[in-house]
UniProtKB/Swiss-Prot annotation:
Key word RNA-binding present: no
Keywords in alphabetical order: Activator, ATP-binding, Cytoplasm, Kinase, Nucleotide-binding, Nucleus, Phosphoprotein, Serine/threonine-protein kinase, Transcription, Transcription regulation, Transferase
Modification Phosphotyrosine, positions: 173
GO-annotated biological processes: stress-activated MAPK cascade
E.C. designation(s): 2.7.11.24
Protein name: Mitogen-activated protein kinase hog1
Domain Protein kinase: 20-299
Family classification: Belongs to the protein kinase superfamily. Ser/Thr protein kinase family. MAP kinase subfamily. HOG1 sub-subfamily.
Organism: Aspergillus glaucus (Eurotium herbariorum)
Cofactors: Mg(2+)
PANTHER family in the record: MITOGEN-ACTIVATED PROTEIN KINASE
Phylogenetic classification of the source organism: Eukaryota, Fungi, Dikarya, Ascomycota, Pezizomycotina
Amino acid sequence: MAEFVRATIFGTTFEITSRYTELQPVGMGAFGLVCAARDQLTGAPVAVKKIMKPFSTPVLSKRTYRELKLLKHLGHENIICLSDIFISPLEDIYSVTELLGTDLHRLLTSRPLEKQFIQYFLYQILRGLKYVHSAGVVHRDLKPSNILINENCDLKICGFGLARVQDPQMTGYVSTRYYRAPEIMLTWQKYDVEVDIWSAGCIFAEMLDGKPLFPGKDHVNQFSIITELLGTPPDDVIETICSENTLRFVKSLPKRERQPLTSRFKNADPEAVDLLERMLVFDPKKRIRAGEALAHEYLAPYHDPTDEPEAQEKFDWSFNDADLPVDTWRIMMYSEILDFHNIDQSEDAGQVLVEGVGDGQQAFAA
């Protein structure tokens, strides 16, 4: 049975197994607190994320289950890797991943990026997206703060909590809005993997220019800024808008011509601008795919078709439309944790799952 140790960080109780020491806070988000720590078992630095109140509502329970199941399924060099997960006696969930020194947001606010770094970072983002998309997963919340980087410039995508969910009206954060594809922002239609290509294009533009490409104050202003650069959406794209209010708004905007990106990115290589043009296209069906982008001339120094793998199997989304009570999500989550630790879900283990609280939970700790 694992021994748990408590510490108070930012006024929050952090309750982890004694395997992890030297806790240092590195980030706080709407859904959790992240601390750097030392793994006593391996000696490696790790990131420990406390998912706060995962069972407080069915929506949060489902979100936590989705992120956990995704991290278990996805295994790729450019995707954050889950190394441990456990439930504390206070019934909080803690996930442990490798620790990378910084993220792209911090990097972009500290200094301009040189060409070779921009190329290498974009290559790794697209390499990760090719794998994720082949698994039938849409990240949907790609932004610089969800792109982790270490001192060797190795890059890993994180933040899969919102992956492939219909817009829950909780995504008005400024940092997220800047990278949002127009088809999500204005809920035009069902969306697919192309939304991540748009986000990657916005991130690419920010790496080239040193500042966000579309810094809208709200969704209306955001869309207006997009049309100032990319012009009015084509008629066949406008016709896909289902909402009458959205359709009225789009048609009320003044007609604008697409501006050549070469005038906006005067110091960028022509190959870089060409790739960006192919990523920032209003019509999702005409946006370049991740695999195609990897083969673009701009990324030739890094492109290796023999080392850009796809997922071996699709992710199982059968749970995603389920409307279940908290207790059911809790049992499903416990089952996933037992599976992660290769614990036989015998009759005894099942009894522990049903109990769900108290000392029995410590059996799930690594």
